[in-house]
Amino acid sequence: MRIPLVGKDSIESKDIGFTLIHEHLRVFSEAVRQQWPHLYNEDEEFRNAVNEVKRAMQFGVKTIVDPTVMGLGRDIRFMEKVVKATGINLVAGTGIYIYIDLPFYFLNRSIDEIADLFIHDIKEGIQGTLNKAGFVKIAADEPGITKDVEKVIRAAAIANKETKVPIITHSNAHNNTGLEQQRILTEEGVDPGKILIGHLGDTDNIDYIKKIADKGSFIGLDRYGLDLFLPVDKRNETTLRLIKDGYSDKIMISHDYCCTIDWGTAKPEYKPKLAPRWSITLIFEDTIPFLKRNGVNEEVIATIFKENPKKFFS
C-alpha cells in the first residue's frame, strides 16, 4: 500500500524509514483563531515548525506522522510550506478530535455522513488540495466514550473499511478508553493491526498496555517529555519492560510534540514545571541511549521506528 505524503508523491510503505508516529507541526483552537487572528503569528509558527523538523531530521528522521485534524487546527497549506522548507516526508490525517460533543453542524447527521467526510479527505484531498489523508485520527479522554465520541469512532471504522487506511487514536491511559476504542473498532470489522492506540505511555500499568497489544493493535508510547502525565524515567522503564517481555513488534514511540500550541495549559511559563524536557528530539537524547545501555540492540530500535510504521501503513 502506498502512503500519501504532503507536498510530495506518495511512497511505498517499505520506504517510510525512521518515523516519528505522533508529532504536531502546529496546534491551535480553530474558533479562537478565526475570531481573533491578532493573537497568532503565523511567521513565528512556521519558523518553529521548520526549526523543530530540521532538528529531528539531524537524528535521521525521515517521516513524521502529524495527527492534527479537525479540532486541533489542521491546515494542509501550512503543512505544505513546512515540507517545502525542510524536505521531510509528512503524513497528514483526517478525523475529528473531540472529548464530549460534536459541533452543532453534526446534529441530526448520521455516522455515514461523518465517514463520508473522512473518505473525501482520503480519496479526493484535504481542504481543496490534492494532498490526501493517510490515516484517520479519533479521540477519547476523561469523559469516556460519549455518544458523539462513539459516532466518530464508528465513522472512522467505515472509512477504514472503504479505504484501508489505518487509525490512530488519542486515549486516556487511566480509564480504559483505549480498550474501548479498540473494542468498538474491531466490532465494526477493523483489523486490529490497523489500529494504533495512542498515549498508552502515560501509564506504567504494564498489564493494561499488554491487553491492548495482545488483541493485535499497536501501542503508542508517544508522549515522551510530557512529565505532567508520566516522567521520562518511568516511561523508559515501561518501554524497556515491554521490549524485554517480547512486545517490540507492537511498540511505536514518539513525543506528541507541538512545535506551537495555543492551549492555556501550554503557556510558556508552565513548561518548566509540567514538561521541562519536552522536545521533538528527547527520545534520541535520552530514551534510545537508555534502551541501548540496557541491552536493546539496533535491530529492535529499527523494529520500533521503521518496521512497525511500515507494517501499520502496509
Curated annotation (Swiss-Prot):
Residues involved in Fe cation binding: 22, 24, 137, 256
Temperature section of the record: Thermostable.
Obligatory cofactor(s): Co(2+); Fe cation
Record InterPro entries: AryldialkylPase_Zn-BS, Metal_Hydrolase, Phosphotriesterase
Entry-linked Pfam families: PTE
Recorded GO MF terms: aryldialkylphosphatase activity; zinc ion binding
Catalytic activity: An aryl dialkyl phosphate + H2O = dialkyl phosphate + an aryl alcohol
Binding note for cofactor: Binds 1 Co(2+) ion per subunit. Binds 1 Fe cation per subunit.
Regulation: Inactivated by EDTA and o-phenanthroline.
Activity dependence on pH, as recorded: Optimum pH is 7.0-9.0.
GO biological process: catabolic process
Assembly information from the UniProt record: Homodimer.
Name this polypeptide is given: Aryldialkylphosphatase
Organism (species): Saccharolobus solfataricus (strain ATCC 35092 / DSM 1617 / JCM 11322 / P2)
Encoding gene per record: php
